[in-house]
């Protein structure tokens, strides 16, 4: 979750390995993140590039304006496809519109901005319409959690009827409260399947996890559960529940839910994998240290210590002020930066909102809790640690995570570095989903004995 704090602390010393159209590192990385969903039909390269070239460099309002135009246009395509009965085309257009709506609202500075919430709701609406035309069964789930619920999607390996004869054509893309676009299912298999549980990190939403987890899992013979926890997506937007460092308190209820649904969902409880993406690499490691039912863990990427990462990107005078407890000076410094730099303003406001903190100083010092230093030896399940060669969010930390897995035999842990030559040097290997998924799932297949 502290990824972007680290980025802003390096605003004047950026040396990112890739600049895509934009010189602004935030715009470049977010564009790549959006384009990366092309692999699973969540984007089209030409649409993304045409949108990007219309955006004014470093202008957050221009970013929103141009992406929302593209999203609305593709959304209208999807509606027309539904009206004409072109359901495959509608599926693809809804997926792209969902991604573009998410991208449009991403950089809106004020969390209370109604455009932010509207863009996310439209992203979710388009995704719901897309999954109604998938050839496999997907259902929304509600995971009981401390008197409330965590939202999720369960993607069944079980295949739906692959013809569209059971779908009633309608011109209305909003299927809320309607079963008109749900196909009848084939008779469920009696087999139980390995299942991948995926959560994001600092800024992803539930629907984005389809491309980054569910789609490759289904292709390789895995069920998949994606969910949002405290500080993420709807849980922070609607329930106002901030991040928590003790993520096992989140994952244990998820495993309880899985156990309660194991027969209905054809889940092999002896083969359940947890994967955390981006800052989720910290969260998943924390959960794996304390939840014994995790069969294997994927840290995508590894995070050793959030506070150390922040300090490594700050000038000495500011580190000294933080460690001396000079909150007034620290807050004043960041307040000045927020007035002059929209990147700083966005990241600080988003960080304080999702963590429930009230000042930059409180946000930064709160990162001390987000450390795996003293818990890695508690992890007993096979663990895969990923790293981008030139990812400067947590430089050198994934290797420390791997080396800290002292309770695991060499055969039960693996550390993979994605190189610039491969195109995978960016944070979370953004832009190379093919090789990333190949390495993740080949390792999981070997660990779990799955044949994909």
Please report, for each region that a protein language model flagged, where it lies by residue.
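N-terminal cap/lid segment of alpha/beta-hydrolase-fold proteins
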Residues: 67, 121-187
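Primarily recognizes the serine-hydrolase "nucleophile elbow" in alpha/beta-hydrolase
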Residues: 102, 269-317
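Short beta-strand/loop motif that positions the catalytic acidic residue
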Residues: 379, 385-387
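Short substrate-entry loop that stabilizes the transition state in hydrolases
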Residues: 162-165, 188-193, 198-218, 233-234
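Alpha/beta-hydrolase active-site loop
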Residues: 242-264
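Catalytic histidine neighborhood in serine/cysteine hydrolases
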Residues: 405-424
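Conserved alpha/beta-hydrolase "acid-adjacent" motif
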Residues: 392-398
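Catalytic active-site module of serine/aspartate enzymes centered on a nucleophile-bearing elbow/loop
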Residues: 429-452
